[in-house]
Amino acid sequence: MTDNQSYKIILNPTSGRGSAGRAVPQIENLLRAYGLNFEIVKTEYPWHAAELARKATTDGFDVVVAAGGDGTVNETINGLMDAKEAGNLLPALGVLSVGRGNDFAFSMGIPTELEAGCKTLASNQRRCIDIGRVVGGLYPQGRYFGNGVGIGFDAVVGFEALKLKR
C-alpha cells in the first residue's frame, strides 16, 4: 500500500511505562513498509501533544496520529479542535495504541496490537466521530473529549490518581 497523504505521528515516549518510546523503530519500519509519508515527533511535557497537533494542522498534514494512550489521544484531540476553532481545516485523527489506557481505541474498534494498528492506519478507513466539550472548573476556556467525561466522584478519583506514583 502506498499513500500520498502526509502523516504527523505525535508519540508520547512515556506512554505504557516507556513502551511507546521503545516502539519507535517498529512503528517506523511498519509505516515505511506500508509506504506512508510520515514524520514522528515525541512529546516532551504535559499538553505538548496539543501544541504539536495544532502545529501539524497549520502545517497542512492530512492525518495527525496520536501514538500513546488515552491521555495522548485527548491532548491531540484538544489541539486539533483548537486549530479548527482558529479557522484551519481539520485533518483526520489516527490512533496507534502504545499506552496503558486505550479506551478510546477500543471504543472506536482500533486494534490495540501495534502491527494491526499500523495496517489499519494505512488502510485509510475513516469515519466521523462526535467530540464533546466541557467548560468550567479547572478549564474555564473549555476542554474537548472524544470518548467520555467524568464528573463528581469520577473526576475526583481521576485527579487523585494523577498524584499517585506509577
Feature locations, PLM:
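ATP/NTP phosphate-donor binding region
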Residues: 1-67, 74, 78, 115-116
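Catalytic cores of large soluble enzymes that bind and process phosphate-bearing ligands
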Residues: 19, 41, 68, 109, ...
